[in-house]
Amino acid sequence: MKFAIVVNINREDALELAQELTSWLQERGLSYVLDSVSGEKTGIEPSMAMEELNKDCDAFISLGGDGTLLFTSHYSVTKPVIGINVGHLGFLAEFSKAEMFEAVEQVLNGTYSIHVRSQLEAEVTMNGGLKHLTALNDVVIEKGAYPRIPTFIIKLDDELLSAYRADGIIIATSTGSTAYSLSAGGPIIAPKSNVFVITPICPHMLTVRPIVISDDKTIQISVEAHGGEFPLNCDGHVSKMLLPGETIIVRKSEQIINLVENKNRRYCEILRSKLLWGHEHQSGS
């Protein structure tokens, strides 16, 4: 088995962990390769372009946090991904540094379990043709530098849902419900729920609320405004600047992400830890 290793190069502890991991793999005669950016920063060989890793490797190891794992997921396709969190417990990167070798051994022995995560697909026009962008967490359209409040026209399966006056619109998966959508007032959705959530960002009216829809719906979004350009973000990365009247289509992607499950963690435990639920009770006990 060959592992692809992706490192958060901006964290010293992640770089150190990469040295530990590759030494451990070498001692056991196991194959690995880093993406070219991680390889250059760590000085570890071999390395190759991120786009080539999936064809050459059997599993991915992400060293960093949820952001690093999100980045890795865009290239892993259906290969299993081990998320090692070098900081605090993550929603996606479930394994701690101390659990890293155990996680790798589970994959080697075939004794691991998988969290299958759905993705979003955004269909947009780019460079004169259609392009399909994927997002594990969310697809977001924001007002950007536009000085007024734009109107976001949203249709579900060609039926008008509403015209939202807001600073932006978030379309999130159940996985992404604990990310930007949660900060904007959206609900927490259990990972295996077959739904998406549409969450307005700072809506103009108090009656505008997030709405949960089944993931078999097709969502059409366009922006009404007098000029301006509006950033389209997929998992936090600006993919395109939308013009007024331009329509994007968001639906469930056929591509899934396979995250290696930490059997020592439970979903409710992760929620309590990350969101400090019951923290006062624990402090007072």
From Swiss-Prot:
Q: Does the keyword NADP apply?
A: yes
Active site (catalytic residues)? D66 (proton acceptor)
> Which family is annotated?
Belongs to the NAD kinase family.
- Spell out the protein name for this chain: NAD kinase
> Which pairs of positions does the record mark as disulfide bonds?
none
Q: Which gene encodes it?
A: nadK
User: Cross-referenced Pfam families, in alphabetical order?
Assistant: NAD_kinase, NAD_kinase_C
Cofactor(s) required for function per UniProt: a divalent metal cation
Q: Name one GO biological process term.
A: NADP biosynthetic process
Question: Do you know which InterPro entries this protein is assigned to?
Answer: ATP-NAD_kinase_N, ATP-NAD_kinase_PpnK-typ_C, NAD/diacylglycerol_kinase_sf, NADK
